[in-house]
Design a protein with these regions (language model features):
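Transmembrane beta-strands of outer-membrane beta-barrel pores
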Residues: 30-36, 63-67, 76-82, 101, ...
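Residues on the lipid-exposed face of transmembrane beta-strands in outer-membrane beta-barrel proteins
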Residues: 30, 57-63, 94-99, 147-151, ...
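Outer membrane beta-barrel
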Residues: 62-178, 211
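Residues that define the transmembrane beta-barrel architecture of outer-membrane proteins
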Residues: 47-57, 88-93, 141-145, 152, ...
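Detector for outer-membrane/organellar transmembrane beta-barrel domains
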Residues: 222, 258-275, 279-361
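Transmembrane beta-strands of outer-membrane beta-barrel proteins
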Residues: 22-28, 70-74, 106, 158-160, ...
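Outer-membrane beta-barrel translocator domains and adjoining extracellular loop/strand segments
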Residues: 36-45, 83-91, 120-125, 171-177, ...
Length: 363
């Protein structure tokens, strides 16, 4: 287990000795993945699975202390996969203590934070690392050690983050699907920061609702959650490299009757030393690593038909456009792409819904 997670666990354990209201919820799930074509990267040593069976569990325990003025949340997660050893893993999604006053709120421990409004990609959502072995869509996140302080004012909410410790991205193993052609050397990840995964990151966000409009501005400084992949000199594997970045973000959503108009964008910068190093490496390997300052944006709409055909469910149609200023489309996912999708919300107690979509490169 990550050493930052152990420290956060120890800090919270003492609070549980006091009398508290307790609530237990969560889920246990079975998953069946069937791949109708052989793995693209099968070889004499490894064969990608055509079928994957999985068991998942994510219980959530909530303790309410001091007449509800303090809350402790513990949410572990575990997955067992029949084919991919890297996908068999566990994580502490949340282990946090929260308290609040009239116009402020503090959270300390391991937690998850979501920023953004778009469906097809999440540009501004940078606090938590992606749990990529779960799914390639970036929806699943690892727990992040943090101290979060929010101030609530009439003109908006300002939230500051101190993020002590970094979580490396998870990747499928050689037998898994949605993997790269070259194997991933996750045991020897490289960092720009001398502190490596002990580097302390910082973030700041302001968000506010003005009539029918939700707006947010964010700033992040620290270790990028998106690794750069460089080939190892001897093994022929890919080595993740985590650079230091500054990122500015904006997200907007307008709720106008049955329409949801969505937009989010970022501007990300790297240190000149890192850009120069990867430019030189790119010259030697004839590759474009995409390490340059860039702008990316996603915008579009969702229109909802409420109760069509006299049913209790709602049907939404979505369309979004994705832009990235980097010229190399193989590096920039969503450089000049369009996303079309549909959502069915069943409006039941479990908030069940089905979301499906497809992205198309316009180049």
């Amino acid at each position: 287990m990550n050493k930052q997670l152990l420290i956060a666990s120890a800090l919270l354990s003492a609070n549980l000795t006091h009398a508290a209201d307790f609530e237990l919820s969560g889920y246990v799930g079975l998953e069946w993945r069937e791949h109708f074509e052989e793995g693209q990267f099968n070889n004499a040593n490894n064969e990608q699975a055509d079928r994957q069976l999985g068991l998942t569990a994510e219980p959530e325990m909530v303790w309410s202390l001091a007449d509800g003025e303090q809350t402790i949340v513990f949410k572990p997660y575990v997955r067992i996969d029949s084919a991919d050893d890297e996908r068999t893993h566990g994580d502490i999604r949340e282990l946090s203590w929260m308290t609040y006053g009239d116009d402020w709120e503090v959270t300390a421990g391991i937690s998850k934070v979501y920023w953004g409004v778009a469906e097809s990609q999440h540009l501004v959502d940078i606090i938590n690392q992606t749990d990529f072995v779960e799914a390639p869509d970036g929806e699943d996140k690892l727990g992040q050690p943090m101290v979060k302080l929010s101030f609530i004012r009439d003109w908006g909410t300002v939230t500051g983050f101190v993020l002590p410790g970094f979580r490396e991205r998870t990747f499928p193993g050689d037998e898994g699907r949605f993997r790269t052609e070259l194997s991933m050397d996750i045991d020897n990840a490289q960092y720009q920061a001398g502190e490596e995964d002990a580097h302390v990151d910082y973030a700041l966000r302001w968000n506010h609702t003005i009539d029918d409009y939700d707006v947010g501005f964010s700033w992040f400084n620290g270790t990028s959650r998106d690794p750069i992949f460089a080939p190892a000199r001897t093994s022929g594997e890919l080595v993740p490299f985590y650079a230091q970045i500054n990122q500015l973000g904006i997200d907007l959503q307008a709720t106008l009757d049955s329409w949801l108009w969505k937009f989010e964008a970022i501007y990300r910068t790297y240190d000149d030393s890192v850009k120069n190093d990867f430019d030189q490496l790119g010259t030697l390997t004839q590759r474009d690593f995409g390490v340059e300052n860039y702008t990316a944006a996603t915008g579009g709409f969702e229109y909802t038909f409420y109760g069509p055909f006299e049913t209790n469910w709602d049907w939404g149609v979505l369309a979004e456009y994705q832009y990235d200023s980097r010229e190399n489309g193989s590096i920039a996912i969503g450089q000049n792409d369009v996303f079309l999708g549909s959502r069915i919300a069943f409006n039941d107690a479990a908030s069940s819904e089905v979301l499906a979509g497809i992205s198309q490169d316009l180049d």
